A protein has these predicted regions:
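Extended hydrophobic/aromatic segments used for targeting, binding, or gating
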Residues: 193-222
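Low-complexity, Gly/Ser/Thr/Pro-rich intrinsically disordered linker/tail segments
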Residues: 237-243
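A polyanion-binding, active-site-adjacent surface
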Residues: 1-179, 187-192, 215-218, 225-237
């Protein structure tokens, strides 16, 4: 459930939100050793989606943008039930990574499967076909730094595994007609936990899709390696649901 008391606490924060404004006790959900998780308003689930993109966890940039959008909408008098969809649309997979992601999805032929012009339209006129989420839904930090999924490995952290089973799995159950595209190896491993437990159908999952971060300089060659396999999987998934 959305922590509205947490979201509304930002109403009175002025200017550009700083780390100290959000990474504080009021917003912290859990802390175990060097691992901390902070509430981030990404609770909206688009149940009409046909494509679900799963990242690792919101980083600081996304966390700040999400709260900034929520704060501004609250100040503008928007009803609570209209705020979360707007936050997800504005802040989900934002920044330079989005351009890389769109090119990679285009290379897999996703627009053709959906009957749209380009993957960019999933963030514009065809946004209702897309849902974005994370293996760890809320912003996770390790040693006060953005958690990148590898140190420590996501599947080895008990707290993170709880998010995968208790938050992500039910979320994916709510979008049964959607293909699931994990962004990178850490999310691959998280989905693997659910597949092995019988909590997720592997036929839905485009395992092996590289992380679109600019730091992954090999992403396009990695896409080329799995292009045929994942393109076929996408075609089979969507054709079976339109027959």
């Amino acid at each position: 459930m959305p922590c509205w008391s947490t979201i509304t606490a930002t109403r009175h924060l002025g200017g550009e939100l700083a780390i100290g404004d959000l990474r504080c006790e009021r917003f912290r959900l859990q802390a175990e050793g060097l691992v901390e998780v902070y509430y981030t308003p990404f609770d909206h689930v688009n149940e009409a989606t046909r494509v679900t993109l799963v990242g690792i966890t919101p980083g600081w940039h996304q966390m700040r943008l999400a709260y900034t959008v929520a704060r501004d909408l609250l100040r503008g008098g928007l009803p609570h039930d209209a705020i979360l969809p707007r936050v997800s649309s504005a802040a989900g997979f934002s920044g330079p990574m989005r351009a890389n992601l769109l090119r990679m999805l285009d290379d897999l032929g996703l627009p053709r499967c959906l009957g749209i012009g380009s993957s960019a339209e999933l963030f514009d006129r065809w946004a209702d076909l897309r849902h974005g989420t994370s293996a760890i839904r809320y912003a996770a930090f390790v040693s006060e730094r953005n958690y990148t999924g590898s140190s420590p490995p996501l599947v080895t952290v008990t707290l993170f595994r709880r998010y995968v089973f208790d938050v992500l799995a039910p979320e994916l159950d709510r979008v049964p007609r959607s293909v699931v595209i994990p962004l990178g190896r850490a999310v691959d491993a998280a989905l693997g936990l659910l597949i092995d437990a019988g909590a997720l159908d592997s036929r839905r999952c485009c395992l092996g899709f590289p992380h679109p971060s600019g730091a992954n300089g090999h992403r396009m060659s990695q896409v080329a390696e799995i292009q045929e396999t994942l393109s076929d999987k996408l075609s089979h998934w969507f054709s079976a649901r339109t027959a």
